[in-house]
A protein has these predicted regions:
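Transmembrane alpha-helices of multi-pass small-molecule transport proteins
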Residues: 30-89, 117-118, 168-172, 189-206, ...
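Specific transmembrane alpha-helical segments of multi-pass solute transporters/efflux pumps
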Residues: 20-22, 57-105, 119, 147, ...
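Juxtamembrane C-cap of transmembrane helices in multi-pass membrane transport proteins
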Residues: 17-33, 38, 45, 91-101, ...
Length: 294
């Protein structure tokens, strides 16, 4: 398989895994957790799981795999910058946004902001060309996700927080390419390490007693494993094979997977607007992945 196919498959897997974030986060909030609790706890749990899983691998080997830069300090600095955008900014503002609006609306604003920011930051930071088909593909995919997910009501706080989260995520994907960091479990582990440190600050500021029960524990583990570990693994791997803009636009397929899961597991029939939106998203993904004419 060529790089485009492999990268697209990883990005689609990331979208499928990320489809679980909104629902689980909402359930955890209804169980008494606040946004700061969820963002920090899912990240530290994910970091713990990966640390145990990768315990026998020497640090030097992990760093050598992540980057060919000889200085460990430089590599950790680059990872710390990416973690601030891709973990702290994404998780912190995304979770707050879920507290101020419908999960579907948060997904629309966040993913649209990520796709658009990745396209333009890729132009200014990576000097990637922006072709007409890339612009049209991005707009089609954003229109598609809006048709499927937008619920009508909105909140200014939701829009602001989701936009910040999405823009940070888009810039994160560009900087991973700029720093030439090799995606995978090693990179994901260190992103989660720095992300846990950043997210500990708002968590401790808003510290309160948490009454853990089975639902809360299972919800946090679900968020830690599915979108946090596996989702970031797939996203960082996709960035190794294709541009940041292509990855972000492909991940706009997230609501398609969410709707398919609802159809399979809870027998919720797809609506006509879902079918129209899916056509727009798929057309957008095909267009942005189209090879430019020589």
């Amino acid at each position: 398989m060529n790089n485009l196919v492999i990268g697209t498959l990883f990005a689609l897997c990331a979208a499928a895994l990320n489809a679980s974030i909104g629902v689980i986060s909402k359930l955890l909030m209804h169980s008494g957790l606040n946004p700061q609790d969820i963002a920090f706890l899912k990240t530290i749990i994910a970091f713990f799981f990966l640390s145990v899983f990768l315990f026998k691998v020497p640090v030097s080997k992990k760093i050598a795999y992540i980057s060919s830069t000889p200085s460990k300090l430089s590599v950790f600095t680059q990872i710390a910058i990416c973690a601030f955008l891709g973990i702290f900014s994404l998780f912190f503002f995304e979770t707050i946004a879920y507290n101020h609006g419908a999960a579907a609306n948060v997904v629309v604003v966040l993913m649209a902001s990520a796709a658009i920011s990745a396209l333009f930051f890729g132009r200014f930071i990576l000097k990637e060309s922006i072709y007409l088909h890339s612009l049209v593909g991005t707009l089609l995919a954003v229109a598609g996700i809006s048709i499927i997910s937008w619920k009508g009501e909105n909140s200014l706080l939701m829009l602001i927080n989701a936009s910040i989260a999405g823009t940070g995520y888009g810039l994160f994907s560009v900087l991973v390419k700029r720093f030439k960091l090799n995606g995978g479990l090693f990179l994901t582990k260190y992103l989660l390490l720095f992300g846990s440190v950043y997210l500990a600050v708002p968590f401790l500021i808003n510290l309160h007693s948490i009454h853990f029960n089975t639902d809360i524990v299972l919800g946090l583990i679900g968020l830690a494993v599915l979108p946090t570990i596996l989702g970031f693994f797939c996203t960082t791997k996709a960035l190794s094979y294709m541009s940041a803009a292509k990855v972000q636009v492909t991940e706009l397929s997230e609501p398609i997977f969410a709707a398919l899961m609802a159809w399979v597991f809870i027998h919720e029939q797809p609506t006509l607007s879902f079918l129209y939106g899916a056509i727009f998203i798929i057309s957008g993904i095909v267009l942005i992945n189209k090879a430019p004419k020589a």
